[in-house]
Amino acid sequence: MNFKYSFIFLFFIQLAIRYNNAKITVDTICKGGKLIQMSNHYECKCPSGYALKTENTCEPIVKCDKLENINKVCGEYSICINQGNFGLEKAFVCMCTNGYMLSQNICKPTRCYNYECNAGKCILDSINPNNPVCSCDIGKILQNGKCTGTGETKCLLKCKAAEECKLTGKHYECVSKPQAPGTGSETPSNSSFMNGMSIISIIALLVIYVIVM
């Protein structure tokens, strides 16, 4: 009886964690990645060599070929597992995490299997996670549930003072503002060299002044 209640408790804990992770908002902090915006949703984008383990956490991608890489990220929403019989035989496989399945070589939410959006991607409805919906590429908008319309989407990302929101490919992201010509600071080595030359010039002028006087 205790085991039964423990199992139910763990099940709801996992469900709560998953539901919480699925809510990526404009205030979400992406661990190891950066927040991007499409037309209807936000998501975390990982740098090269990293992939999403959960909706807001990027981890290094490993090659699924040895025991120490078990349960580590081997692709987007996928982890390395050992399918060997009771550990006696090694059969390392990169498999989609719970709630995702392989579709066109990408781990997508199970509810999004074979759900086409045209110029966009399938995501789960933030209000009803059982419903697949389309989030369009920037420049496209929903039309009859698909990303077939043309329209503008305003960037709502909260970029830092030294950043600006920029359309990168098919999404918005915060990037560093370009420096105006001539406003960039000198490198430390150049600055030190120039300071040294200034001091030498001043000393030389003083010596010449003393000799002349």
From Swiss-Prot:
Glycosylation sites: 190
Coiled coil: none
Lipid attachment site numbers (GPI-anchor amidated asparagine): 190
Predominant location category: membrane
UniProt GO cellular component terms: cell surface; plasma membrane; side of membrane
Alphabetized Gene3D superfamilies for the sequence: Plasmodium vivax P25 domain
InterPro entries documented for this protein: EGF-like_dom, Pvs25/Psv28_EGF
PROSITE patterns: EGF_2
Membrane topology, from the record: Lipid-anchor; GPI-anchor
Keyword Ribosomal protein among record annotations: no
Domain EGF-like: 30-59, 60-108, 108-148, 151-175
Signal peptide: 1-28
Cystine residue pairs: 64-80, 74-94, 96-107, 112-122, 117-134, 136-147
Keywords assigned by UniProt, alphabetized: Cell membrane, Disulfide bond, EGF-like domain, Glycoprotein, GPI-anchor, Lipoprotein, Malaria, Membrane, Repeat, Signal
Protein's name according to its UniProt entry: 24 kDa ookinete surface protein
Natural source organism: Plasmodium berghei (strain Anka)
